[in-house]
């Protein structure tokens, strides 16, 4: 397929990005993708410390347990992404995104109050399942909100913003854990998804 590109060569990349951030739906979804990636990666750095100190796990098993928990969340996220087509036949995409973000926020609180490692892992996997809906649906909604000939620049900017979330999540969660304790990371991540 070939498209006739209608982008003015004199128009700067920054002005193109600004023009799309004026669209409320695009701005909201780009922010959501940033916060989603921020929340997904934010728990990673504190998870071993949380399991070791608050759940009193033996040092030799902490890395294995954390690996299993992260794998479970990733696996369930992939399963959710695969099943989006069937779910969008029954529910609207905005409703799925809204439900998924609230479910993830609730599940982060449940992860914090779980007294056992396996309960934490189960709730993390379920949170991963709901996270698997957010990114593909948000990207689809963004693509519907912008003209075809300008999607490349928009998705380039969206990818950059999502990567910033991946980088800032661990940095800020480490700072929050240092200042307020590991529990504050779970609560602040939940708050991000409730926003």
Where are these regions (language model features)?
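A membrane-interface helix-boundary motif in multi-pass transporters
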Residues: 175-193
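Short amphipathic helix-loop junctions that connect adjacent transmembrane helices
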Residues: 46-64
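Intracellular juxtamembrane helix-capping segments at the cytosolic ends
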Residues: 133-146
């Amino acid at each position: 397929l070939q498209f006739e590109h209608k982008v003015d060569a004199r128009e700067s990349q920054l002005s193109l990005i600004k023009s799309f951030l004026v669209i409320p739906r695009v701005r909201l979804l780009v922010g959501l993708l940033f916060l989603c990636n921020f929340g997904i990666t934010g728990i990673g750095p504190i998870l071993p410390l949380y399991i070791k100190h608050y759940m009193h796990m033996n040092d030799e098993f902490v890395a294995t347990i954390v690996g299993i928990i992260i794998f479970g969340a990733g696996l369930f996220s992939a399963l959710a992404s695969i099943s989006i087509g069937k779910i969008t036949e029954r529910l609207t995409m905005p409703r799925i995104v809204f439900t998924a973000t609230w479910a993830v926020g609730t599940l982060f609180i449940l992860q914090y109050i779980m007294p056992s490692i396996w309960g934490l892992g189960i709730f993390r996997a379920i949170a991963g399942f709901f996270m698997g809906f957010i990114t593909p649906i948000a990207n689809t909604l963004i693509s519907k909100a912008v003209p075809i000939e300008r999607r490349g620049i928009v998705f380039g900017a969206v990818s950059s913003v999502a990567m910033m979330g991946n980088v800032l999540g661990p940095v800020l969660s480490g700072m929050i854990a240092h200042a307020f304790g590991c529990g504050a990371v779970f609560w602040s991540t939940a708050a991000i998804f409730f926003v």
